[in-house]
Amino acid sequence: SRMIRTLQEKEKLLPLDSGGVARVIEYAARRMEDSEKLSLHQGRLSNLLTESDFRARQAGAKVIGAEHVTGAAQAATHRLDQFREKSHEGILREIMLVDTSGTAVGQVNGLAVYLLGDYSFGKPSRITATARLGAGKVLDIEREVDLGGQIHSKAVMIISALLANRYAREHPLPLSASLVFEQSYGGIEGDSASVAELVALISAIADIPVRQELAVTGSLDQRGQVQAIGGVNEKIEGFFDICKARGQSGSQGVVIPSAHEVHLMLRQEVLDAVEQGQFHVYSAGTIDEALQLLTGYSIESIDASVLARVAELQRLARSFSGKGVDGEDSADDE
């Protein structure tokens, strides 16, 4: 509040009432993606206060209230909102395919955040996986075509190691798998899709359907712990906007890392929907928790299905090891 008062005096602005101060603090906390910390970027705060002052004077008010700050913040967003609207329109017109209901095997709704200067917005992305008999390699299609960055490639390697360590400690993993961000035509960077990618892989291997009414974001370590990511508020709101536009079912929502529970600074509209049970924000601290939320199956059932499929692929691998190229029993020429 001291910085707010300093900027107010420096710019000769109207005083703020308690509601106005609270709204500015909320805005600053959202910019930091942390409800326990505030952004001290003077330029942004100065712009917000100046716009709020203009709105208050236009309304004939003697103080800047919460409604003036809210209007200023929304106006700043609206000026760049055409990019978000165009992106979301592609999903709503089904040009970009993203399901928000039903189930699908090997398909998960990931969440991405797009940055345009100081403006950012979230959008769901369809991530798919396939699994078949092979030599244990997880193919990162984004990397193969030079669309995947180094951090994303590292994340896929961590997923591969986690998968092998979990289901094939004492023998080679007898499968080949592939991962891809569908309908993505630009570079992919970051590790925030790690949870979504591993869930898609396990779903494809075990033939277990994933709830498409949920989206997920989160990084992973080799022990299966879900780690923090960036842009959590924008990602939640991006999926919420799509669900709302299509008509909320009451079962839609997002899964985020547990570490972000204190970082949420969501729009009031989203908070109201959560309070009314129309939208849900779940947290997961481990891949086990994420799997159970996204599939509705117990982790014991999921692991049993994966191990059964791995055992089946091992039997197939052994049967092929004695076959020639044409599938006939190999023999010496003697």
Where are these regions (language model features)?
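Conserved AAA+ ATPase core "coupling" helix
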Residues: 1-9, 23, 292-295
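Conserved helix-loop functional segments at active or binding sites
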Residues: 6-13, 26-34, 54, 58, ...
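C-terminal helical "lid" subdomain and adjoining coupling/linker elements of P-loop NTPases
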Residues: 10-16, 29-100, 317-324
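Conserved phosphate/pyrophosphate-binding and hydrolysis machinery centered on Walker-type P-loop NTPases
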Residues: 14-21, 35-46, 62-66, 145-149, ...
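Non-catalytic, well-ordered alpha-helical scaffold segments
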Residues: 22, 43-46, 50, 67, ...
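Core mixed alpha/beta domains of very large multi-subunit molecular machines
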Residues: 71-72, 78-149, 160
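Peripheral, non-AAA+ core regions of ATP-driven protein-machinery
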Residues: 93-96, 125, 131-147, 151-334
